[in-house]
Each structure stands twice: as structure tokens, then as C-alpha cells.
């Protein structure tokens, strides 16, 4: 996703002191504090990052001789930077403003503390610049676990989600799920147009918040499990013990995948609830049900051998 300086001005409510180039793009979420550059160090300068000036940099410039400030500002603005943000509502040095206008560089100001500006800006840019993809499926929150239900078109994903919503769980997205990877974590959301809507074949589109209340939907959710629905295949050996873990890679992040075969009489909503509960159990307990059975069998064998 392309992010420009104009975007952060609007979204982060920044004051414009000097207007720079139109549609100036920000390509990284990393931030630079240019104190070393103001001291004359340019062996390494991350000029492609947003430059944030706080109290330390401001005080350093303030106590510098006028002629030296002029030289340092001239050198600093020879490098192309996306923008400069001055925190704490500080008054910029006249030489900074003069050189910014000369080189058409954005200079912005925030009333927030420097650490708040840096944190807010990095979180914003991380979210906006994160790798993203769109997948076909339904994302629901079941017992606090993000379940991405996938499968062929018409397999019953939306109908299963509707049953889960009826049972008190929450819908995040239906049909199309927008997924972003931030620090190795996958977060799913709904496209704006279909947000809160669920399509059920034979009925059409259902407004979930209108029918089940605002608590029945979520704006975004971390994806913990992928449930793949498929028609029962008699010639396939399905995992009956849960020993073999299967994973689906989304944006280079492996997500545990469960394949659930469909045939008459199977209650998919109950199965998905059990999968979510079992996942939570696995997070809290180190011993899996399979290991418990193995331990019981070993104990039984030992007891038999003692007789």
C-alpha cells in the first residue's frame, strides 16, 4: 500500500509548517532521530526514514553557534527525506525552515511528546505498509480464537459461520478476507463494502449486526487456525488422532490447518467450536490428548507386566 506524507498529515493530525513535494511517498516504518546528523556525522544517515526532532535535537540546535547551524542545516537538507516531524509543539529554528523551503521538504509539527510521536507513527506505518493479501473464506472469532474457514465455493462456509454466530460467536469477514502480516502475526479484516454482511445461498445477503446485534461482529482478528472444509473422500485417510500437524503458509507465516470432511450428519459448528477449545487447551497445557492416551497405555502395560 502506498503511503504519502499527505496521508500521515490527515490521519495523525499533524500541523504543516512547510509544504514539500506533492505525493511524497514514505517507504519504511522505521524512524530516525537526526541528532548525530546535526552534530555533523554522515557516515551513516537513514535519510529514507521519517525524521523526528524532539527536545534533545531541538536543544542541541538552540545552543549551537549561528554560523554552524547554517552549515549543518545546509548539509542536512542536501539529503532527500520524506518529511521532518517536530514533536512537543516546539518552535523550529529559522535555518531549518529556510532550507526546507529551499529544497521543498515537508516540515510538520505535533503537540505530542517525542516518544508518543515515534510510537504512534511507527504503529501507523507498520499497519499501513505491512504485506497483505486477500483470501476467499470466512473469518470468525470462536472463544477468542481467530478461525479462517476455507474450502471450495458452495461447500457451506457461510452457513457454518451463521450457525456459529447464532451460538454467540462473532463474524469478522465473509467471502473475502483481507490479511496483513505484522511482526509475524496475521490479522484479518473485512473489505469495507462487505463489512458486517454474510451471504447465504438461497437467502441472499444478511446484515449480521442488524439481526444479531453489534456484539456479533468484530472489525479485525488475529488468525490462529485455518479450517479447510471438503467433501468426504472415501479413498482418503483422514487424521483421526491429531498426530500429524498440517500448516498453511500465508504471507510466509505458517498457520495450523485442520481439514474437516463434510458428509450428512456432521455438525460443523460444533466441530469448529471443539477445534477452537482444543487450540486454547493446547496453549495452556503442554500435554496433548494423544500424549495422555499414550501415557495411559504405557502405564497399563507397566502394570500388566508387574503381575
From Swiss-Prot:
Active-site residues per Swiss-Prot or TrEMBL entry: 136, 157, 175 (proton acceptor), 240
Keyword annotations of the record: ATP-binding, Carbohydrate metabolism, Kinase, Magnesium, Metal-binding, Multifunctional enzyme, Nucleotide-binding, Serine/threonine-protein kinase, Transferase
Pfam families noted in UniProt: Hpr_kinase_C, Hpr_kinase_N
Record flagged with keyword Transferase: yes
GO BP, one annotated term: regulation of carbohydrate metabolic process
E.C. numbers: 2.7.11.-, 2.7.4.-
Binding site for Mg(2+): 158, 199
Region annotation (Important for the catalytic mechanism of both phosphorylation and dephosphorylation) ranges: 198-207
Region of interest called Important for the catalytic mechanism of dephosphorylation, as start-end residue ranges on this chain: 261-266
MF (Gene Ontology): ATP binding; magnesium ion binding; phosphorelay sensor kinase activity; protein serine/threonine kinase activity; protein serine/threonine/tyrosine kinase activity
Gene3D superfamilies: HprK N-terminal domain-like (3.40.1390.20), P-loop containing nucleotide triphosphate hydrolases (3.40.50.300)
Positions with a binding annotation for ATP: 151-158
Claim: Glycosyltransferase is one of the keywords in the record: no
Coiled-coil ranges (or none): none
Reaction equations catalysed: [HPr protein]-L-serine + ATP = [HPr protein]-O-phospho-L-serine + ADP + H(+); [HPr protein]-O-phospho-L-serine + phosphate + H(+) = [HPr protein]-L-serine + diphosphate
Cofactor requirement: Mg(2+)
Written domain comment of the UniProt record: The Walker A ATP-binding motif also binds Pi and PPi.
Described purpose of this protein according to its UniProt entry: Catalyzes the ATP- as well as the pyrophosphate-dependent phosphorylation of a specific serine residue in HPr, a phosphocarrier protein of the phosphoenolpyruvate-dependent sugar phosphotransferase system (PTS). HprK/P also catalyzes the pyrophosphate-producing, inorganic phosphate-dependent dephosphorylation (phosphorolysis) of seryl-phosphorylated HPr (P-Ser-HPr).
Family statement: Belongs to the HPrK/P family.
Other known facts: Both phosphorylation and phosphorolysis are carried out by the same active site and suggest a common mechanism for both reactions.
Quaternary assembly: Homohexamer.
Protein name (database record): HPr kinase/phosphorylase
